[in-house]
Amino acid sequence: MTSTQRTLMVMAGGTGGHVFPGLAVAHRMQAQGWRVVWLGNPAGMEATLVPRHGIPMEYVRFGGLRGKGLATKFALPFNLLRACAQSLRALRRVKPDVVLGMGGYITFPAGLVTVLTGRPLVLHEQNSIAGLTNKVLAKLAKRVLVAFPGALPNAEWTGNPIRTELARTEPPQARYAARSGKLRLLVVGGSLGAAALNEVVPRALALLAPDERPQVVHQAGAKHIDTLKENYEAAGLSCGSDVALVPFIDDMASAYANADLVICRSGAMTVAEIAAVGVAALFVPFPHAVDDHQTTNAEFLAEQGAAVLVQQRDLSAELLADWLRGQSRDSLAAMAERSRSLAKPDATDEVARVCAAVAGANQEGKQ
């Protein structure tokens, strides 16, 4: 670190929905000459993922504010105090010029200590319904950014930071116009798979005549790949040229861009990526998401004709088969174009710009 190099601390952890947008901003800031340090939980996915990206880490142990039983509630004051002390030590070691909170349990104690020690805090909320931590910290932060308009009062709508390759895909008009033959369907269950999709999609495809069936790439999750194969075989469909089963997809930009239609959950990052690429989507929100935020995430596109929303309780093989029969490449292309028009492909640059501006304003205030 040089004497003039500025430092960003990113606070994020727990799930990919918090960590991956944080990584996108971290890499952009590094490219602009910033030193970046990550604050996370040693038990979270960030503890293994972030160091692989060459970003040093500081750690805070904290399990969240929402109650998980009587013992957890009684222990909350002690755990919060300990996490605040760990956050204070980390901030003193790193001496950041600005702190970016991207969500996750540790953001609460670390965000409080950031403000109490006079350091500037920038918050980013990825979901359409803000979490408890960001609702509290939004009142204390210098700038509040949101991925979905209206998620927090008096916030700036930047969109969700995404990987560069997703924002650089060919426009949907050109992609869809260049295709012929069967529709291309991508089914994405996430890294853990989605049992409801794994069960319903094979049965729905079996109800279609062979010439009506799309070509399918079905990402199942490593633990579910054998069960999914059995589901397709039970439906009378063999896995081969028209159905490809994969446990994981490394290059999501290409997978989205090669599809005419995606059937998937509606986590914040998934919705942002689908809009950025511009691809038609049928969203089936995870019904047990906190505050049912996946439904409102999907509604952002669905209410403007840029996607279709089907609740899991309503999803059936018959419903899905009937809907697929009514789709054409032209109708899906129109949906994809509307989706692309609602994207915020420059979100990563915008969040980075805000962080730099806040750091600069804070430095000027000290002079």
From Swiss-Prot:
Q: What keywords are assigned to this protein? A: Cell cycle, Cell division, Cell inner membrane, Cell membrane, Cell shape, Cell wall biogenesis/degradation, Glycosyltransferase, Membrane, Peptidoglycan synthesis, Transferase
What is the recorded membrane topology of this protein?
Answer: Peripheral membrane protein
Classification via Pfam families? Glyco_tran_28_C, Glyco_transf_28
Question: Which pathway is recorded for this entry?
Answer: Cell wall biogenesis; peptidoglycan biosynthesis
Q: Does the keyword ATP-binding apply?
A: no
Q: Which GO terms describe its molecular function?
A: UDP-N-acetyl-D-glucosamine:N-acetylmuramoyl-L-alanyl-D-glutamyl-meso-2,6-diaminopimelyl-D-alanyl-D-alanine-diphosphoundecaprenol 4-beta-N-acetylglucosaminlytransferase activity; undecaprenyldiphospho-muramoylpentapeptide beta-N-acetylglucosaminyltransferase activity
Positions of UDP-N-acetyl-alpha-D-glucosamine binding: T15, G16, G17, N127, R163, S191, I249, Q294
Coiled-coil boundaries? none
Subcellular compartments: Cell inner membrane
UniProt GO cellular component terms: plasma membrane
Catalytic function, reaction form: di-trans,octa-cis-undecaprenyl diphospho-N-acetyl-alpha-D-muramoyl-L-alanyl-D-glutamyl-meso-2,6-diaminopimeloyl-D-alanyl-D-alanine + UDP-N-acetyl-alpha-D-glucosamine = di-trans,octa-cis-undecaprenyl diphospho-[N-acetyl-alpha-D-glucosaminyl-(1->4)]-N-acetyl-alpha-D-muramoyl-L-alanyl-D-glutamyl-meso-2,6-diaminopimeloyl-D-alanyl-D-alanine + UDP + H(+)
Give the principal location in a single coarse category: membrane
Annotated EC: 2.4.1.227
GO process terms (BP)? carbohydrate metabolic process; cell division; cell wall organization; lipid glycosylation; peptidoglycan biosynthetic process; regulation of cell shape
Task of the protein:
Cell wall formation. Catalyzes the transfer of a GlcNAc subunit on undecaprenyl-pyrophosphoryl-MurNAc-pentapeptide (lipid intermediate I) to form undecaprenyl-pyrophosphoryl-MurNAc-(pentapeptide)GlcNAc (lipid intermediate II).
**Family membership:** Belongs to the glycosyltransferase 28 family. MurG subfamily.
| The protein, known as | UDP-N-acetylglucosamine--N-acetylmuramyl-(pentapeptide) pyrophosphoryl-undecaprenol N-acetylglucosamine transferase
Organism taxonomic ancestry = Bacteria, Pseudomonadati, Pseudomonadota, Betaproteobacteria, Burkholderiales
